[in-house]
């Protein structure tokens, strides 16, 4: 695959994580750059691994993976988005939330997995092309690191303007990503 195509693929694959990061940044009470970088690193690491996993699965069982990846992503994103909406409606004070609760590792990993299943599907497709899968996966991971960190920082500035609605908006964004994944699968 040509360098330009790899870069375009990498940034294209990072867009779901970018959108989710904006939502996450908006829901946190004044996230610091270190939190944004942590989010970017987690999203980037997961987004690096998923095309590699997809590539391996593509060699073994591409039909099953392609038939189910959109449903898995949809269910995960609907669950996470619904949870964020419910928490946003219930309210509560941002100051009462501990940093671990607000930005837990496992919540970030789950969100990262949900937004990177399309990268796994791309990895399946790459199994049938002449590509350097390691270089391509690293490019996708680096682009996701950059875009997710940037998304968190953008969300940081949007969040105070939205107040409690930020968590609801973040949930709607995740649900929207899930619906978009399902829509794209059924409507090309």
Swiss-Prot record:
| Transmembrane residue ranges | 3-23, 41-61, 66-86, 106-128, 143-163, 168-188
| GO terms for biological process, alphabetical | intracellular manganese ion homeostasis; manganese ion export across plasma membrane
Recorded GO molecular functions are: manganese ion transmembrane transporter activity
Can you say what this protein is called? Probable manganese efflux pump MntP
Q: Which GO terms describe its cellular component?
A: plasma membrane
The membrane topology term of the UniProt record is:
Multi-pass membrane protein
Family per similarity comment: Belongs to the MntP (TC 9.B.29) family.
Keyword set, alphabetical order: Cell inner membrane, Cell membrane, Ion transport, Manganese, Membrane, Transmembrane, Transmembrane helix, Transport
Q: What is its main location?
A: membrane
Q: What task does this protein carry out?
A: Probably functions as a manganese efflux pump.
Q: Where in the cell is it found?
A: Cell inner membrane
